[in-house]
């Protein structure tokens, strides 16, 4: 996975503090 979400949902900001809730 990517930052706890499926690879299909992986996005550059997923690991960024400003977008840490993206895809949660």
Curated annotation (Swiss-Prot):
Family of the protein in this entry: Belongs to the conotoxin A superfamily.
Keyword Disulfide bond carried by entry: yes
Miscellaneous comment text of the record: Negatives results: does not have any direct effects on neuromuscular nAChRs (human adult alpha-1/beta-1/epsilon/delta or fetal alpha-1/beta-1/gamma/delta receptors). Does not have any effects on human Kv1 (KCNA1, KCNA2, KCNA3, KCNA4, KCNA5, and KCNA), Kv2.1/KCNB1, Kv3.4 (KCNC4), Kv4.2 (KCND2), KCNQ2/3, and on the Drosophilia Shaker potassium channels. Does not have effects on the fish potassium channels, TSha1, TSha2 (Kv1 homologs), and Traw (Kv3 homolog).
Domain notes: The cysteine framework is IV (CC-C-C-C-C).
Covalent S-S links between cysteines: 2-10, 3-15, 13-19
Protein name: Conotoxin PIVE
Modified residue annotations for Lysine amide: 24
Function: Probable neurotoxin with ion channel inhibitor activity. In vivo, elicits dose-dependently excitatory activity upon injection into fish. Its action is slowly reversible.
Tissue specificity of this protein: Expressed by the venom duct.
Main location: secreted
GO cellular component: extracellular region
Lineage of the species this protein comes from: Eukaryota, Metazoa, Spiralia, Lophotrochozoa, Mollusca
Sorted UniProt keywords: Amidation, Disulfide bond, Ion channel impairing toxin, Neurotoxin, Secreted, Toxin
Compartments, record wording: Secreted
GO molecular function: ion channel regulator activity; toxin activity
Protein's UniProt keywords contain Disulfide bond: yes
Signal peptide: none
């Amino acid at each position: 996975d990517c930052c706890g979400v499926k690879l299909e949902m992986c996005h550059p900001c997923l690991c960024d503090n400003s977008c840490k809730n993206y895809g949660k």
